[in-house]
Each structure stands twice: as structure tokens, then as C-alpha cells.
Amino acid sequence: MSNVLGMYARSVKENFVKGNGSYLYTDKGEKYLDFVQGIAVNALGHNHEHLVKTMKTQSEKPWHISNLFLIQEQEKFAKRLCELTKFDFVGFQNSGAEATELAIKAAVKYYYSIGKPDKNRIVCINSSFHGRTIATISAGNNPKHIEGFPNLPNFDHFDFGNHEQFKEKITNKTCAILIEPILGEGGVKVIPDQCLKGLRELCDEKNILLICDEIQCGYYRSGKFFAYQYA
């Protein structure tokens, strides 16, 4: 019996022992093309020579010195990301769920800090996926994820493609709109470029923040560094 807590229904019995590029190999020598990519988080493939060399080099340096101190590699990475995205700052997190949590907290805290504490509601798409914390499952509003858990009250939802329903959810208490430019677990639905442009214009007009969750579709998975860049 496995000592790993049974959080996932593992119906696949293959035991992968080696990876190379986009391929995985089992202990029986079988070769598989990896379309799963660790649930869309391993966009760089397996065992890339450059990455292996980089990790070996870093393993001989301090492993963790806390964000209270200057970390040169972190500074370099942040600068590169800002060059690619044209943003000014990067906040590093341990996971996609934590990144979405940070975005949710930042949106609410921003309006609180400028004297608008009641502007604290976030509009999201039904059955989207933003993580498995209490806040992120409330944002996603997927019945199979929120069953048995308290649904946080600060989220308003609309069905994908229902523009009228979306407009009804925008109020003077809306602080942000949280979307996946390409819904993953919601059915691989792509928000059209014109709709993304319209969202940006609406947010500018209404003084609302726009949050794009690209944990599963960013890093060139769609062709560009981020999917929102098509708009």
C-alpha cells in the first residue's frame, strides 16, 4: 500500500523512469510523447542539457537565503521577465495557486489602500481553474472543486461567452476581472482577441484591474510568451 495520500484517482499504472525532451520512458522501455507536461507546468520538457547544467551550477551555491536578502539570479530573472512583458515588477511565488492568490489579494488591497474598501469584488468565469486553495476554488466556481468547502462571497461569476451576463456582474464594487485567456480545465476555450481588447478597454473605463491567469497557457504554449499578447 502506498503511503502517499490518495488525493488523485490514479488509473494509469505506467512507471516513468526517464525523460528526454518531449518524451517519457517507462521501466519497461516503452516510449510516450508527453502531452500532459505535469498538468501543463512542465513546458520546458525533460532533461534539457542547458537546464541540467544550470541546476547543477546553482546546486553548488546557497540553496535558500530568504527573500530578506538580495538574490542575484532572482534579480536577473525578474529583469528578463520585465523585458519580455513590458511590466515593471515581478512577484515570485511557489505555485500557480499562490500566484493567483497574490493577484487576488493585491487587487483587493490596492483599493483598500486608496480609501475604497468596499471595492472588493472580483468577476470570474464559471468553471475556470485558478488553483485549489479556498480563494482560488471560489474564483473558479467549479462544482466538483468547491463541494464541501465554504464558497468565499467576494466573487461574481458569468458563463463563458455570455456577454449580457458579464455586463450585469460589473458594479461599482468590482475591483478586478480574473480570467484565463485560454481556459484549460474549463474545456480549452479561447477568449477571442477582440474580447480581450474589449476587457482591457472596459477595465480602463471603469477603473478596474484586469488579471490574466496564464499558469497553464503562458511561456510560449500558445506561440507567444503570453496568450494575452495576441490582443
Please report, for each region that a protein language model flagged, where it lies by residue:
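Conserved N-terminal phosphate-binding loop of PLP-dependent enzymes in the Aspartate aminotransferase
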Residues: 1-231
